[in-house]
Amino acid sequence: MNLTEDCMVFEDVAIYFSQEEWGILNDAQRHLHSNVMLENFALLSSVGCWHGAKDEEVPSKQCVSVRVLQVTIPKPALSTLKAQPCKMCSSILKDILHLAEHDGTHPEQGLYTCAAEHDLHQKEQIREKLTRSDEWRPSFVNHSAHVGERNFTCTQGGKDFTASSDLLQQQVLNSGWKLYRDTQDGEAFQGEQNDFNSSQGGKDFCHQHGLFEHQKTHNGERPYEFSECGELFRYNSNLIKYQQNHAGERPYEGTEYGKTFIRKSNLVQHQKIHSEGFLSKRSDPIEHQEILSRPTPYECTQCGKAFLTQAHLVGHQKTHTGEQPYECNKCGKFFMYNSKLIRHQKVHTGERRYECSECGKLFMDSFTLGRHQRVHTGERPFECSICGKFFSHRSTLNMHQRVHAGKRLYKCSECGKAFSLKHNVVQHLKIHTGERPYECTECEKAFVRKSHLVQHQKIHTDAFSKRSDLIQHKRIDIRPRPYTCSECGKAFLTQAHLVGHQKIHTGERPYECTQCAKAFVRKSHLVQHEKIHTDAFSKRSDLIQHKRIDLRPRPYVCSECGKAFLTQAHLDGHQKIQTGERRYECNECGKFFLDSYKLVIHQRIHTGEKPYKCSKCGKFFRYRCTLSRHQKVHTGERPYECSECGKFFRDSYKLIIHQRVHTGEKPYECSNCGKFLRYRSTFIKHHKVCTGEKPHECSKCRELFRTKSSLIIHQQSHTGESPFKLRECGKDFNKCNTGQRQKTHTGERSYECGESSKVFKYNSSLIKHQIIHTGKRP
């Protein structure tokens, strides 16, 4: 008997459907039918079909069972197999899948698409590839029919499979071809191995599961719900990560500082910080050095930069020509590279598939996610070769290095001022154009920058404009103070604080310095004082300030005074002081300024602009610092305490000035009479007395005055104006001390003598009275 009578061809195992029957099947049934036919066809193609093989030598055989199919398989030693699958079988496969009428319509279309109307049509194309290319022919080396064995082996990877369909899927992965396509993306992907590229565009996937998962981005489906808070997720993996965040679970702990992480990969990345010479990417140093040592034969004729490949050079040259060939079909924006267009298009679709495992923030691409994760790991792989400072991103390093080089590539076309960064010159140009695009909805004030608007809007709320103001505000202690001083009425939290305070009234100073015999009320004051006699710092703030001394080399030296600077920009700013260069002139008074921002602040004097409003009382201020100082009046905040007398102050500089009373310091010396004065304001007034200077002249009578306030009071004599009037008696006063004069009507006597309990209206009267008890004249 002829052996070919026991052998099967594809017609023997093919399952046919009529047009009507095919229309009844749903998508899942059609996919199942296609997969079964594809598996059977692939198996027959691998062993050779027996159409027209009657005249050929029939080899000895062994049989393998696949589902219900008995296929005769020749021994591998024989060379009688056909080089290509049978064209007749290929035609039968097309007829079965009802695709013959579409032959040649789209010869390069992919196997599966997201759109249902293209599903069957694109299946035909992958099968044509199977019939034309040896690359798709599975190769079998173990042909045993024992159940459970892995009878199909991939020749490229050596991996074994139990079914030929699994082998076919693996060979698809090895080839890099993507059989599943989403036509809704509108993205065209190019590559040597991606032969199934739809003319309509579409994203490709190796697995059908990947296509289904991707399609959730189009329909907005989020099937995975967290039971605790009801948060929905598109992927199960994202739900698992979120659950770890919600529970605070951080199973991976670093050995250096005990920092914990949700994912092991984040821990590994973080540990690179503690190792010397870590790289920014996950590659070993030897491989990194090999990359750096590769020849770069393709050189740019414009800037001399060299590249590894011709493609990299072509891409780089677009930066010189300004060519932007890739256009977004949504907003019309152009891009230099296709990858940037693809990334930009995700802005329109809202697709953010990459989630940070630490904070749950979503990103459009893995590159941006990788950059973001450096915030959590603390990784700073880019080091400045000049000052040794580390940066998280290369772009930040490049900007920083311009400071050392003194490069100011971007110049203002109006005034010629140069800037290191492009966005700085864009912001600067708004000064010349007067453009203020950011307007406050509360007071309609406009700003050049959005950050200025955000800062300004805090004025209209109860929020603090600065973090330091919030910290100072939190120091206000609102706890009850039950311990009251019988001498001055001051209250304290504890009995110990009260006892320490009462030493001020008794004059007791039990703690004496062994070096200079100076005595103190409190032991802490003595300890603080003794640091003066050592090399230690008296205050922690002084130590912190000392640590800020920069020991880095300062290569930029001023030729006038010899002072050295870290950067060229700092030297340029310093030299303006030496040369007296003041390019910014006030149009009102002709005064010149070194910087434009100082001119802007100065011009508020002429315009009367007071942009900073107190949200409590509605008062306006010219400067932000003045507003911050004023707001402490409403909060009652006095965080700065004098260590000598316990008095509190709103500002640190007022405390410093006050402490001169205890130290006896008088830093201001009059050059005319040699007198020393404690305060600058007193010194200015005194200096005018010594020199006879009277700069303020009355326009009516030409009388001169030393101070502007004196001139204003004098001018009221010409106008007859008396701006200060008492409500009780209607009497007018030129000066604003109406509060003191009201005591005449109210009978208030707020100043009491501690010795005789006698009370007085004015503090000056009390001081005069106390001379009776002490015998001392102030």
From Swiss-Prot:
One of its GO terms (biological process) is regulation of transcription by RNA polymerase II. GO terms for molecular function: DNA-binding transcription factor activity, RNA polymerase II-specific; RNA polymerase II transcription regulatory region sequence-specific DNA binding; zinc ion binding. Residues 8-101 form the KRAB domain. Disulfide bonds: none annotated. A zinc finger (C2H2-type) spans 152-174, 196-218, 224-246, 252-274, 298-320, 326-348, 354-376, 382-404, 410-432, 438-460, 483-505, 511-533, 556-578, 584-606, 612-634, 640-662, 668-690, 696-718, 751-773. It is found in: Nucleus. GO terms for cellular component: nucleus. Pfam families: KRAB, zf-C2H2, zf-C2H2_15, zf-C2H2_6. SMART domains: KRAB, ZnF_C2H2. The keyword Oxidoreductase does not apply. There is a cross-link at K761, K768 (Glycyl lysine isopeptide (Lys-Gly) (interchain with G-Cter in SUMO2)). This is Zinc finger protein 749. It comes from Homo sapiens (Human).
